Amino acid sequence: MRVYYLSALLSLSSFFYTCSYPEISSDVLVYENSFENDNLSNIDGGGLSTFNNTTVIGDFNNDGFTIHLDDVGDHDYVFVSFDLYIHGSWDGNFNGNSEKSRVPDKWIMEFKPEMSLYNDPDYYKYETTFSNSPCFGNYCLKQSYPNLYPFSNNPKTGSFNSELPRKCNGYFGGPSTSLY
């Protein structure tokens, strides 16, 4: 019985050892922008606005922007970090009252499709949904974040702050802003 246990333990430890990842030997900052100085260089489709006493890129309402980064250099990993403000009536995985208008409010981050690292389109974009909607009884517009679409999580799941001031006004203005 001991030999079997030791054999299983050795097999299990070698499995974990082979699944280890290499250490990151250096960090190189490639792009940084607080937008406070109105700098939109290397950005197409971006506009600036003020929210909560700071300058932000946006509002986008069914649109987006592109950041062009040249001469990134050879790398094994890319770490992307930013503050994402979700304003107004994002309805997550389910949007609209009629069967024809029930399409998700998707948020997509895409990387250059010609990257030689991956040829599978699933690896060069991150697609998820967000919901700022409240839940009432059985009525709850779920979101996918922090998972990929079409996962189902409660509204505002994973938000850093879900009670920031309201930016959008009017009938479809929705609730407060959420920060991710």
Regions inferred by a protein language model and the residue ranges of each:
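Sec-dependent signal peptide recognition
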Residues: R2-L9
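Beta-sandwich/jellyroll recognition modules and their flexible linkers
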Residues: S20-Y180
